[in-house]
């Protein structure tokens, strides 16, 4: 009887250990799938930013900001909230109604994701004309984003800090 209970105990512990290993491997695979999906959604956000910057679509330029976002631009007070960001955008476009973005490229690196939040560092290059008669202007800048995963799995910018 004693030998049977020892064998049963060993079998139980071995099964328990195998279950833990299998569960942790499954969790790792789930985390990897989630991380891959997050990276794909963040890349979509980047592509949307490029597309909407080139077209200067007012609605599109607001779509990648979270409702409670904060944007820091050089020489300006921070825009706190999506409505404040939109107001600043509208003021800029009223000041330069003939603005034309000729080219825009961004490259993000060092994307770190943790618990529905991400941060990233980006470099941007653009060429634009403030009016049809103005000469083209080149601009290079860096940007730091804090991103927030939305309930639908998409990502939005929660904070953006731009430097030149």
Enumerate the language-model features and the residues they cover.
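A short, structured loop/turn motif at beta-sheet edges
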Residues: 110-118, 148-154
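Short, low-complexity N-terminal intrinsically disordered segments enriched in polar/charged residues
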Residues: 15-67
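Beta-strand elements of well-folded, non-transmembrane domains
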Residues: 126-130, 147
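Conserved glycine-rich acetyl-CoA-binding loop
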Residues: 133-134, 153
């Amino acid at each position: 009887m004693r030998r049977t209970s020892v064998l049963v105990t060993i079998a139980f512990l071995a099964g328990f250990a195998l279950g833990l290993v299998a569960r942790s491997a499954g969790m790792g695979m789930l985390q990897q799938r989630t991380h891959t999906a997050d990276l794909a959604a963040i890349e979509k956000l980047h592509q949307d930013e490029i597309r909407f910057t080139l077209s200067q679509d007012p609605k599109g330029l607001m779509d990648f900001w979270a409702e409670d976002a904060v944007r820091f631009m050089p020489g300006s007070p921070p825009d706190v909230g999506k409505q404040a960001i939109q107001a600043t955008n509208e003021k800029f476009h009223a000041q330069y109604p003939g603005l034309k973005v000729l080219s825009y490229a961004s490259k993000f690196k060092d994307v770190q994701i943790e618990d529905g939040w991400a941060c990233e560092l980006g470099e941007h290059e653009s060429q634009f004309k403030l009016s049809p008669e103005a000469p083209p202007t080149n601009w290079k800048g860096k940007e730091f984003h804090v991103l927030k995963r939305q309930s639908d799995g998409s990502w939005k910018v929660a904070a953006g800090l731009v430097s030149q």
